[in-house]
């Protein structure tokens, strides 16, 4: 939005040229989202406490979690608001990639909000019925997938980028839609599963978003895309703004979510952030890179799948409790140790993922 204003004002003073620089807008976009989140946090937390919108803790969970009962939840509202405002201010709003991510972010946020509202306010332990949750997630994911396929059909925008192989970029055709669907919905639910400890989900989200900011910048730059042997996508550059807004909003939220948490993001935050990361990966043609950089989310999800599968097939559990972060809690690890070690692993995976762009 401000880019258009600056383009009009530049004829009055060359200072406004600075708004045309992607790096400048990325930095101020991050700071804008961070400041909004830091400002909004205390007000939202106070309102959630007043409305008695507190976390519901399962009795079968780790005993250390009982003290979390009643902690304000649905704090993801501040994350989504910060990202949306920052993106609308600093990104070019004629860019279809920006609107795809915002559609999923807000749409999945609404799904998560309804789920949280039913569980916390209506005291319905089921929340939003699973089949309806997946139905609306699917509708939004398919809407984005079909739209982007129509725009980028038979171009690099629908190729599959395979790590380590610079010449392996098959054209997916209609399989693009199927892949996009599973990546967006899968990542959304993976982040949701990971969001079980104070700050556990938000910091890996920040790391992955920061990694994708670099990838988006390279993908949208014809020279760097050629150098790294990845598809050049003309709309990709503006995703840098979205990614840095996620980083800023995530860090602002972490200020209040760090152990011991003053607020939890709830499904309104986790479903939306996961969906946004999945959408960004699809738009950048870096689904495999998401699996590497978002390895913490992948492992958390696999632990649940293996646990459920093992119990149904053999009547035995593999882990003491799933997702796997609860397994380590029940082994006696203090919660902060689990959180920080998962953060370290996440940072390492993001760096490894970025390295694969060059090792081709």
Swiss-Prot record:
Q: Where in the cell is it found?
A: Cell inner membrane
Which cofactor is essential here? Mg(2+)
- This protein's species is Proteus mirabilis (strain HI4320)
Q: Name one GO molecular function term.
A: metal ion binding
User: According to Swiss-Prot or TrEMBL, what is its membrane topology?
Assistant: Multi-pass membrane protein
Quote the pathway field.
Cell wall biogenesis; peptidoglycan biosynthesis
InterPro entries named among the record's database cross-references: Glycosyl_transferase_4, PNAcMuramoyl-5peptid_Trfase, PNAcMuramoyl-5peptid_Trfase_CS
The protein's name: Phospho-N-acetylmuramoyl-pentapeptide-transferase
What is one Pfam family matched by this protein?
Answer: Glycos_transf_4
Q: What is its EC number?
A: 2.7.8.13
């Amino acid at each position: 939005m401000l880019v258009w204003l600056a383009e009009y004002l530049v004829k009055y003073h060359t200072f406004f040229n600075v708004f045309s620089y992607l790096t400048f807008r990325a930095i101020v976009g991050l700071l804008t989202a961070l400041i909004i989140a830091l400002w909004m946090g205390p007000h939202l937390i106070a309102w959630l406490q007043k409305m008695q919108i507190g976390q519901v803790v399962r009795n079968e969970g780790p005993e250390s979690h009982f003290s979390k009962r009643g902690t304000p939840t649905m704090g993801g509202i501040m994350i989504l608001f910060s990202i949306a405002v920052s993106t609308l201010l600093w990104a070019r709003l004629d860019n279809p990639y920006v609107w795809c991510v915002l559609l999923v972010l807000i749409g999945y946020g609404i799904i998560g909000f309804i789920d949280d509202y039913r569980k916390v306010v209506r005291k319905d332990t089921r929340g939003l019925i699973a089949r309806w949750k997946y139905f609306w997630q699917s509708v939004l994911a398919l809407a984005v997938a079909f739209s982007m396929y129509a725009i980028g059909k038979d171009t690099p925008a629908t190729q599959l980028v395979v790590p380590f192989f610079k010449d392996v970029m098959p054209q997916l055709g209609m399989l693009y839609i199927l892949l996009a669907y599973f990546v967006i919905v899968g990542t959304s639910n993976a982040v949701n599963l990971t969001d079980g400890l104070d700050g556990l989900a938000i910091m890996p989200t920040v790391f992955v978003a920061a990694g994708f900011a670099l990838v988006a910048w390279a993908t949208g730059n014809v020279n760097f895309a050629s150098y790294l042997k990845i598809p050049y996508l003309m709309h990709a550059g503006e995703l840098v703004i979205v990614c840095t807004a996620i980083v800023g909003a995530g860090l602002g939220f972490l200020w209040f979510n760090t152990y011991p948490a003053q607020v939890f993001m709830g499904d309104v935050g986790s479903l939306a952030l996961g969906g946004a990361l999945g959408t960004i990966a699809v738009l950048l043609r870096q689904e495999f890179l998401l699996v590497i950089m978002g390895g913490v989310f992948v492992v958390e999800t696999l632990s649940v799948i293996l646990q459920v599968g093992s119990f149904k097939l053999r009547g035995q559990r593999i882990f003491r409790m799933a997702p796997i972060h609860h397994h380590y809690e029940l082994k006696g690890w203090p919660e902060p140790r689990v959180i920080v070690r998962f953060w370290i692993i996440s940072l390492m995976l993001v760096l490894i993922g970025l390295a694969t762009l060059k090792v081709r």
